[in-house]
From Swiss-Prot:
Compartments where located: Cytoplasm
EC number: 2.1.3.15
The protein's assembly and partners: Acetyl-CoA carboxylase is a heterohexamer composed of biotin carboxyl carrier protein (AccB), biotin carboxylase (AccC) and two subunits each of ACCase subunit alpha (AccA) and ACCase subunit beta (AccD).
Gene Ontology cellular component terms for the protein in this record: acetyl-CoA carboxylase complex
Family to which the UniProt record says this protein belongs: Belongs to the AccA family.
Broad class of the protein's primary localization: cytoplasm
Biological process annotations from GO: fatty acid biosynthetic process; malonyl-CoA biosynthetic process
Gene Ontology molecular functions: acetyl-CoA carboxylase activity; ATP binding; carboxyl- or carbamoyltransferase activity
Family matches, as InterPro entries: Acetyl_CoA_COase_a_su, ClpP/crotonase-like_dom_sf, COA_CT_C
Keyword vocabulary terms for this entry: ATP-binding, Cytoplasm, Fatty acid biosynthesis, Fatty acid metabolism, Lipid biosynthesis, Lipid metabolism, Nucleotide-binding, Transferase
Reaction catalysis annotation: N(6)-carboxybiotinyl-L-lysyl-[protein] + acetyl-CoA = N(6)-biotinyl-L-lysyl-[protein] + malonyl-CoA
The name this protein goes by in its record: Acetyl-coenzyme A carboxylase carboxyl transferase subunit alpha
Amino acid sequence: MNLNYLDFEQPIAVLEGKIQELQLVGTDNDLNISEEIDRLKEKSTKLTENIYSSLTPWQIVQVARHPQRPYSADYIARMFDDWDELHGDRHFGDDKAIIGGVGRLNGRPVMVIGEEKGRSVKEKVERNFGMPKPEGYRKALRLMEMAERFKMPVLTLIDTPGAYPGIDSEERGISESIAQNLAVMSRLRTPIICTVIGEGSSGGALAIGVGDYLNMLQYSTYFVISPEGCANIIWKTVEKAPLAAEAMGVTSSVLEELGIVDETIAEPLGGAHRDIDTMAEKLKTRLSEQLDQLVAEDMDSLLERRYKRLMSYGNAAS
């Protein structure tokens, strides 16, 4: 896979370009330049470690939005056996910005629900760039209630720039659909684990984000409004987005300190897009371990703790 490098990764891109040039020269001329290639690879690894050890919140926002970052569909394909996608909300239609269905995680039946941005231009349009409409959240709700009936745990994968704010979305009750999901998820009698895999923005993320565990991948973000939106409101210019990202505390490390996030799951060096298979295996292992803990707990105690957790959001005294 040819990687797209972000602005702050350009020194890495230069080194990787030299490595590729030397590899081509070695192939064409049968020259033994493996030692030089190994030296440059080691240098590139150290440079990547150095850059990624001190990322700013705004740089982490960029990594979370990386065009090659794995989406929900990528994780589902790698983590779940016997996957069977389910469609429609039984009220209006099938929103492709939300994908959901039944699969097996290490043999255990689970209901998986994820927000999906789409990879190609055509797919991005079909999936509305990962911005669900009311029918998407109602589809998610239908699948969660089905999971409760069949005693299957629910796993959600959060990755959205936000719920779709268009007129048609408002006409069909986007606010009500989000609120209904919050209410039902808070009392759903089955374990729920939520994981932010990319962008977790506003009510669009929270609508499938109420659970017993909330994980964030290391370079994912979670916020009430995008840094650009915040900057535009407060400073009247998007150029202040880096400052807004810093002030809002959008990263997993800050949110874990605040008690909003339970666990940060480490990503491969350079981000999840550098090694999707390794990231998927790591996430699969951790979700399986968390499910083992949750299914062993008393359901009433689980629900009480889940509800208290939801009510504590935004409470400075919690």
